[in-house]
Amino acid sequence: MIRPARDGSIRPLLILFLSVLGALLLQTPSLAQAARKLPDKIPPKRTSQIQDGFGINSDLPRDPYLPWNRWWWTRMFDAGFKWIRIGQYENSSDRTSWDWIEQKRGVYSSSPELEDAVDSLVDNGMDVQVQLLYGNVMYTAHSGKLPDVSVPEPGSFHNDDRSLYSVYWPPVTPEQTDAFNKYVGWTVDHFKDRIHYWALWNEQDIGYWNPWGDAVQYGHLLTSFVDTVHKTPGAKVIYGGQADPSRDFTQRALDTCKCASGIDVYAYHTYPGYGQNMNPETMDYGAYLNESPRALRDLVTHTPRIKPDILFFDDEFNSIGTWIGSDDSVQAKYVPRGLIYNHAAGVKTFVWLLTAATDGNESDDFGIIRGLTNHDYDFTPRPVFYALQNTNALFSDTKFDPTIQVTGADVATLPRRSDFPFLSYGFRSKTGKAIVAYWLAAHSLPGNTFRTLYSTFTLKNTGIQHPVLIDVVSGDIHLLEWKQGTTDTLEALPVSDSIMAIADADYFDWPVLPEAPSSLNVTSSGNVVKLSWQVHGGDPQHVVVERREESSSARGSWQRIAELAPSAVDYSDSRVKKGQQLAYRVRATNAEGESASSNIVRIGAP
């Protein structure tokens, strides 16, 4: 404690000290202020908060293996995925497929389940691409007698299958092609206000196109597909989902099609070392021998009449923990690495798969959320789910900035010290804030056994004032300090086979919205409709119940009918008229905003 002299001589010094201190505090936020604002973990960013983000593949809900009233569907909105690719149920067809849409010759229809799923995606902020596929036995069966109806394939059906009535027989004759394009035209027009991206087929270069991928046949079908899709204003064409980065297949398909100017997106898939542990960066050096996604994109961009702004989707990517030499810890490192590696190259990545339908032929291997196996861990996230939630929060709505660089004498030694390439990329958010991602492109081993190295980095052109270190897999955030006397150099930074990121302490500038309620169920008793659901995290302060009245001619709009306490898990609606067809959903709210909505339930009032 400072005790003033009797003559008061300390007072001028105290006033001067306080004035200088105040001026310093007004100039820039102090280190202490930055530390006080810093979260311990990466705050999640929901789909509704993102304009341009990463993608996920998903089957549409289907009982009994993917029931909509379990907690899996809404988690893609909570985790901040912005794009979704639909059209397959595992390796079979789904509700958007030709054998589902046209079940009687010349009669096209959607289903309430499909309409509700699409509404859920669009209303919760997702951008949707649909694969239009496969064959239809009324037209493409390899039988001298064609059936008069199409019975959709079960979820257990999968390639390779060359039986007479397999849906993998493609439309190749003029009559078959015309029938396929009628299905395409009806579907694109029906969803024109909700879905704008349409892909032709899936992995047409392998066993999804019988008897085996045929580039010339695919090119012929692509010609009329481009014209059919573009008849609907705003609809975009995706060259759909080539399984391997074969330049020869693409070249022959485009040469046959002569429709390069009509392709809006080129899509391909990457599973480096399918079935075994190969790090994602090997997609461009070794996983495909003399082929690579980089070389494939170069071929496409140099194709005559191709659009100069053509988009590239890596719309199936994963490296699953059950593959030989891998585990869940390897997957949690590899998948974010693949996303950011592609992001720096301008490629949008779609992870395969949200949740596995275990009636398919790939068990419960691919889902970032576990599927139904009748265990207590059913529909629980794998570690990679949280790593992707962190990736989405940090890098959605960012653009690669080549002027941001990581340099330093230590950096050049990292490949020699580790035997693996060192990768670093700088990005800027939509508000101009910089974030730097770095890692060693290592072959990771099970059990988190990689030995962490340490290095000094000099960051160029970031504008970062109060640097923080972010572990993308764990989500941990730690405050850093610039090397004394510098504002761009950081010492003793950990470098490993997992993505670390450096940003400013004020990078986390988004509010945390509640997680969506899930597991909505509905029953009725007399003229009362009873609802029940589950509420989750994100500090919900209210639960809102919404209702929509259905009719044969039109779908009504959603109306809020109740606002309940955050602990509420049920509600009874007594304002029901006899014969009404009703749909319900619920969402959570807090002071920052609202969650995504739950699954939709329907019921007819008695």
Task: Show the residue positions of the predicted features.
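Boundary/entry segment of secreted carbohydrate-active catalytic domains
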Residues: 35-89
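Substrate-binding cleft and catalytic face of glycoside hydrolase catalytic domains
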Residues: 79-277
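Noncatalytic carbohydrate-binding groove/subsite architecture in carbohydrate-active enzymes
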Residues: 215-341, 345-350
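Aromatic/acidic polysaccharide-binding cleft in carbohydrate-active enzymes
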Residues: 323-415
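Carbohydrate-binding surface patches
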Residues: 410-463
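C-terminal beta-strand-rich structural cap/linker in extracellular carbohydrate-active enzymes
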Residues: 479-513
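Pro/Thr/Ser/Gly-rich low-complexity, intrinsically disordered linker/stalk tracts
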Residues: 511-539, 578, 592-606
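Beta-strand-rich modules
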Residues: 573-593
